[in-house]
A protein has these predicted regions:
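Residues within mature, well-folded domains
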Residues: 25-171
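Intrinsically disordered, low-complexity, compositionally biased regions/tails
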Residues: 17-18, 49
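Bacterial N-terminal signal peptides that target proteins for export
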Residues: 2-15
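Residue-level marker of intrinsically disordered, low-complexity segments enriched
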Residues: 15-17, 125
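C-terminal motif of bacterial Sec signal peptides marking the signal peptidase cleavage site
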Residues: 20-23
Length: 171
């Protein structure tokens, strides 16, 4: 009886800790629209990538690639005020890419530098690949295939081999 109570208490304690941790916000989530961009750099450090936006603003990015699955992106207006902050390596963000319309520049500005680039000569396609978490559960790779003019012609998602339990001890 005593061991049963102890196991139940430990399980309940572990569940409470897990619940509390899920409520923890990421540092960028507490930055409201309209805040000065310096608030972000104070919390996250200087951005590793900066891109110009069509309206004259900037997109600041803090990637965790090549081994991470997250890139925090902040859109900042010309006066240096935050418009929005979000995690861009996400299936809903990837699905915004328009086949036949988006270019390499569009992909770069929206998702940052890829974790991997390759070229398939028989397809005549350059491929940019990004790591991400799908539904915060599955480790995935999302790839953009570009034609010779740099236009997105195909996208593809696949499981991330880095997290494949059958391939962990290859070497």
């Amino acid at each position: 009886m005593r061991n049963t109570f102890r196991c139940l208490r430990n399980a309940l304690g572990g569940a409470c800790v897990a619940l509390l941790l899920t409520g923890c916000a990421q540092p960028w989530q507490a930055v409201p629209p309209g805040a000065d961009a310096s608030v972000l750099t104070a919390r996250l450090g200087p951005p590793r990538e900066v891109y110009d936006l069509p309206d004259g603003g900037k997109r600041l990015m803090w990637p965790t690639q090549p081994l991470g699955e997250f890139t925090t992106a902040a859109d900042v207006d010309v006066s240096g005020k935050v418009i929005n902050v979000r995690q861009v390596l996400d299936e809903n963000e990837f699905y915004k890419a328009q086949i036949g319309v988006w270019t390499k520049k569009d992909v770069l500005v929206n998702f940052g530098r890829p974790v991997e680039t390759s070229y398939f000569p028989l397809m005549k396609r350059e491929v940019w690949t990004y790591r991400y978490m799908e539904a915060n559960i599955w480790y995935m790779m999302y790839s953009f295939y570009f034609d010779d003019q740099g236009i997105v012609r195909l996208t593809q998602k696949t499981p991330d081999p880095l997290h494949d339990p059958d391939r962990r001890n290859v070497f």
